[in-house]
């Protein structure tokens, strides 16, 4: 039976019921709905709506229902209920009779679902924080293992300056730390309890909402009932935080896909996270990374969806808000599996050091060092930049690296060049010169790793 049937005389259309029912999606809020109902039983007992004995019986029945459904989750979806709240109430009435009909006193599905969803976001958010911290640890371990593996750094996907694989890992460590911070902040803002806000104007029973919030492990109650039942910022923020994190994961995936390609061959991926071709027997495809990259757009879509759903809703609750969950649930599922897969990819990754070093030695990645050398001899940087550009053009024509020019040849470009130029053009010198906070010099990388491990 619907929870709202008394007002209506005609039968609900079967098509409308199919369109309106949310149980196929919101069944995932079952545990939160039971936990919230247990807290609500205590709240209405505190204002004399039910006796202590009735409260005890309601809580026992709710806990029994929790155990039953955990043992057989299919009970929910085969119930025919409109939504998870209807399922819990109907199951409760089946257990304790008319006493079960008292539980909803002073409560609306509006504040009920708002509470359930915040509880769910808190629980899933904490699990996602743990996953992000796992990714952070894996990146840090890889950075420590490969801190001195030389590879080319890129701008515009053109070889730019030599860096190390450890430095690359630390870049994604920084991104992951921002993701962790963002999610923690979002969970802090979502840590308020809407229960007791009623449909929109507040419950008619003068209960202690601070105690109710504490019973559900929220930091405080919400402060405006209109906002409380219509607020979905926590959904938007979780989807937004996920979108930014997925963007970082997608960038990392793209880097690794390129590094793994035959054209680069800087890394090898384990068989655990790759697949083959149904036609070409030689193929080893980076499918885990490609799926991370692909699922990013799906997460973005859910963020745009909830923003669009909420953008023109008047206060307070509107049925449009029923559309808040499907996208959110998919975002959390997609983000979680992508974080798990990223950790698995990194744990089995091997750096092909000779190939990466060779690539770093090519592409005239030491050109900036030659310009800096000229500056050290007194030439203005802009002039030095122009001179080195001419040297590179000549080197390309001769198909040689800069360091293979004779001193006499180099002097034709700038007479101030001396024999001491050559030590400045080695890969080791290129790295060592970047000995500044955040730079790619090996001591800086080691210090950064040590500092992050010490936190």
Curated annotation (Swiss-Prot):
GO cellular component term of the entry, any: cytosol
* EC numbers, comma separated: 4.3.2.1
Disulfide bonds, which pairs?
none
User: Which Gene3D superfamilies does the entry link to?
Assistant: Fumarase/aspartase (C-terminal domain) (1.10.40.30), Fumarase/aspartase (Central domain) (1.20.200.10), Fumarase/aspartase (N-terminal domain) (1.10.275.10)
User: Which locations, inside or outside the cell, does it occupy?
Assistant: Cytoplasm
The question of whether Cytoplasm is a record keyword is answered with yes
Top EC group: lyase
What are the alphabetically sorted keywords of the record?
A: Amino-acid biosynthesis, Arginine biosynthesis, Cytoplasm, Lyase
Could you mention a single GO BP entry for this protein? Answer: L-arginine biosynthetic process
Tell me the route in metabolism or biology where this protein functions. Answer: Amino-acid biosynthesis; L-arginine biosynthesis; L-arginine from L-ornithine and carbamoyl phosphate: step 3/3
Q: Name one GO molecular function term.
A: argininosuccinate lyase activity
What is this enzyme's catalytic activity, as reactions?
A: 2-(N(omega)-L-arginino)succinate = fumarate + L-arginine
Alphabetical list of InterPro entries matching this protein:
Arg_succ_lyase_C, Argininosuccinate_lyase, Fumarase/histidase_N, Fumarate_lyase_CS, Fumarate_lyase_fam, Fumarate_lyase_N, L-Aspartase-like
UniProt family annotation: Belongs to the lyase 1 family. Argininosuccinate lyase subfamily.
> What protein name does the entry list?
Argininosuccinate lyase
